[in-house]
Amino acid sequence: MKILFLSVFITFSLQLSLQTEADFVMTGHNQHLPFRICSIATGTDLVRFDREVSCASYGSNIKTTEGILIIYKTKIEAHTFSVRTFKKELTFQTTYRDVGTVYFLDRTVTTLPMPIEEVHMVNTEARCLSSISVKRSEEEEYVAYHKDEYVNKTLDLIPLNFKSDTVRRYITTKEPFLRNGPLWFYSTSTSINCIVTDCIAKTKYPFDFFALSTGETVEGSPFYNGINSKTFNEPTEKILFRNNYTMLKTFDDGSKGNFVTLTKMAFLEKGNTIFSWEVQNEESSICLLKHWMTIPHALRAENANSFHFIAQELTASFVTGKSNYTLSDSKYNCINSNYTSILDEIYQTQYNNSHDKNGSYEIFKTEGDLILIWQPLIQRKLTVLENFSNASRKRRKRELETNKDIVYVQLQYLYDTLKDYINTALGKLAEAWCLNQKRTITVLHELSKISPSGIISAVYGKPMSAKLIGDVLAVSKCIEVNQTSVQLHKSMRLTKDSSYDALRCYSRPLLTYSFANSSKETYLGQLGLDNEILLGNHRTEECEQSNTKIFLSGKFAHIFKDYTYVNSSLITEIEALDAFVDLNIDPLENADFTLLELYTKDELSKANVFDLETILREYNSYKSALHHIETKIATVTPTYIGGIDTFFKGLGALGLGLGAVLGVTAGALGDVVNGVFSFLKNPFGGALTILLTLGVIGLVIFLFLRHKRLAQTPIDILFPYTSKSTNSVLQATQSVQAQVKEPLDSSPPYLKTNKDTEPQGDDITHTNEYSQVEALKMLKAIKLLDESYKKAEIAEAKKSQRPSLLERIQYRGYQKLSTEEL
């Protein structure tokens, strides 16, 4: 029995599973409204609708006034003025003279302030003196002269080639003087250079110092005149003032240039420089405000505690206080005549026929230190126009001239009234929006009693579960199930004992589902609205005949006829009822905001007293001038020359004398060595040296071989004629003796006889022994024989020698005779 029951159960389960797979419909899920279970948990949040909302009514209290607006800004540019400096540059140069070269060893430069009397001479004559007094101490004072001439001359100023836009320098000595001392001696030369610089100085409020474009500074106000209270921190005994001072404007044309007369001139000695500048009146030469812009058509809006000045051209507003600003400081006096003339000009050209001045001009100051000059205006026909706009709206005939006069006023009035109307309309819209929200909250509160979950989900914008608990709502979050596990049943009829009940049907379709984080166990529920899963299957109704129902699930619409699934279609195929009222509002056009450049780049660059760019340009130009001068002085100096000079200078007077002696010696040796090396470096000298070296090597080899032969055969080497026959030697000797009238030396007695002069061949090779006297006589005879043979060879060479071209031309017409004819 057990086996039979088990087999029947398995068979029934398989049939049920096959039938189940066929009775299910797979549902698509919706990301916005997923399948979920919305049941109230134990711990929930309590919420309520707040209906006590108060809406404040809108009322505009802004008053606008039209007028003319002039804006002044603080002048940040530094005050610039001309400064002229004077100095004398004393240069001591030590040189060492070599053969063809003068070496520059050391250079001592001392800069001294130019004497004030000489400054006046420069300003009027464009020249300075060639001497300068140098104080080493209170008791010692030396006078140096240019080129060591010991004569006080005048030197003309010449412009320096290196210049910039802000600096112009004049000098008297382009190249330092160099003394060419004795050869291989050290010498020292003196040069004096007068340097006058025309440059630009800058000072900034409160004008307690000024800086030159060369980088130098003066700690004092340029407006200090000796008696006023301006700041001046330099020693007052170093400054001098001259009234009605006449001077050359520039030194380009020398003393023939243009002269200018200045009211007051200041001369300050600071360090090694004399500074001079014109003392001006600060009140008349300085203006701390600068005109920025003028707005002929501007509006002023009055708020509770401030004024807003609006300019349509600038797309900006300037905020000020309501109290007028008084320009009591003397630094503002410079703009009084300026803004009054601008106001009068604009009024006469643009508003004279249509507006009247509504009182005098007013002055305000913004938080950004801008000064606003405001001239309020009032339209002459504004009152008439207001009465006209409130009168009857019927058409009236008007003359053409009247229409032209009224059009401009109407447009201006329309602009002002439209602004008020728009602001009022926006305020009313805000008030109406507030009232509408209040009423909507009341409606939602009442609807929450019918469908609390739907209302709460609409408010929060996501699926929520809600339940009315008395006067408040209990809210909880829905639990999402496994979206792929949801299966919709195809039949909505109740089953009773494995057969359908014909009287009862489900009001909502059945479905099975499982949770995401649980086992594969499935649960039974019913499909609710918006993909909500209703727990249980107790929602039934009496079955109706010819019934058609459509249920939405995910993105599909499932169609049931007579409580049985027929097919599915997309939700988008069902036309939606458009119950949403669109609010069509065109956005405002883009406003092109004008960039307000309060200070230009040029003004910002001029705001600083120290101009780094100008200082660096001046430094580089002066450096270039010094480099040009140094290249004219000397070539590269060997390091050992400067070292020797420094060493012997340290030994005092004895060292200087010893250094002079050693300098001469070392210089001579150095020149010889340098000459040899220079000759070897030359291509011709190098090639000649190689050839001479090869010749010397060949000569050594030749002498070595000759010495070797001499050691082996001395007779053949010393007396080469011994290898010849006796008769040829005797004939050559006798012919030479016959031609010589006076013998060079007396012959031995045994050579004067015929018997002795004609030796036999056997006697030459005789081997008898001789005495020392006979041997000496034989050596002398050999000597005479050698000399005779050599003379015979010379005579033979002359005999065969042809006359040269010069001899043939000189002795033309003559015939050469042979020696036998003589």
Curated annotation (Swiss-Prot):
Virion surface side: 23-683
Signal sequence, start to end: 1-22
Transmembrane feature ranges: 684-704
Key word Metal-binding present: no
Chain ranges on the Intravirion side, renumbered to this chain: 705-822
GO CC annotation, single: viral envelope
Name listed for the protein in its UniProt record: Envelope glycoprotein B
Organism: Human herpesvirus 7 (strain JI) (HHV-7)
